């Protein structure tokens, strides 16, 4: 059935829709399936399924219903681009406080439309949120400024937070795990649980929390510097998440503000993120996105992009989210990911299709991880343009030839090298831990700095 007469209006102007402030706008890359309708007909069916319609006209439809139809307002068939305007009245709101929810946003904009028989694929690449709807989201309650404050740094441009993930990701018992934390903290700032770490039979949660608390206190006494840890509180059950968080805060006591809470936001979903945001508003909310590649990968033509995921995370209240390495690490990514980092940190930013004003909503910190080490960092910072972020380098720290503490120091020295505008090989001559990173990661060293062996007088590793 051709629904384009009802669910499409190509006379609408995007500027007018934005000025009106009553629509969420979404941009998709969509391809109709052969043998069905043309591009506009398929787009209109997609819009109907995403709002008030179905595959037939129903007798219960009235004038009010038609007034909240989602409408296709722009198409670019040559590039498979489709833009849809969703009236904000369509989106579900909390009964308890009238707030907006990402679950409803996803259900409409990327729900049943993903399984439509006449759509070969459709993927959301950007969305715009009008002020009236944006103000209904929680947004972050804490930011990187809170971590800088704990670390004793300026709360503006407080700089690079040197972090790691304890490796191996599974298999360490509580005391060896805590010992690895202590080792890294002798040179670094921040440690996170890897995403599967929790309450395994070989590493009971409470025992691990107590051991990490003791290791943090020893490291702080040894270095005279504050330290940070991000604990995974992800669970299927709201009460389990709260119980884990409360036990951590009780154990760390006067160091409670040194603790962040990590949530596997993609696999556990928006409800888990909101549980952490609302139950623990004083804690830094660390959004881990494990599993997101199933829909965000450039190889996947359905779902939504990593850019969309990060923008949703800011709305939900994530203090920080993993944003990849912009192609400088081991995970999928590209230099264009810089736009994602700016979208979640700035108050006014451009996405691939829409400009977004955040109206003073707190920023979300880019957390960089996935195959990074000291040698890759100068190029990464060049691409991003600043170093106000958290980096969690697992192998990049514990793969250092001299151990975790030296690995942490090499990461810090890499940022110092970049800020000084120095040549990395020349800088390494006066910075031992950074120099030893060349020996620790010779494959990267050969690729990035081909003459390093002669310049540093080092043998092949």
From Swiss-Prot:
InterPro entries found in the cross-reference section: RuBisCO (IPR033966), RuBisCo_large_chain_AS (IPR020878), RuBisCO_lsu_C (IPR000685), RuBisCO_lsu_C_sf (IPR036376), RuBisCO_lsu_fd_N (IPR017443), RuBisCO_lsu_N_sf (IPR036422), RuBisCO_lsuII (IPR020871)
Cofactor binding annotation: Binds 1 Mg(2+) ion per subunit.
Coiled-coil segments on the chain, per record: none
GO biological process: reductive pentose-phosphate cycle
EC numbers on record: 4.1.1.39
Cofactor: Mg(2+)
A molecular function GO annotation: ribulose-bisphosphate carboxylase activity
Binding site for substrate: 112, 169, 289, 322, 369
Modification sites for N6-carboxylysine: 192
Binding site for Mg(2+): 192, 194-195
Family annotation (NCBIfam families): PRK13475.1
Family label: Belongs to the RuBisCO large chain family. Type II subfamily.
Function per UniProt: RuBisCO catalyzes two reactions: the carboxylation of D-ribulose 1,5-bisphosphate, the primary event in carbon dioxide fixation, as well as the oxidative fragmentation of the pentose substrate. Both reactions occur simultaneously and in competition at the same active site.
Oligomeric and partner information: Homodimer.
Protein name: Ribulose bisphosphate carboxylase
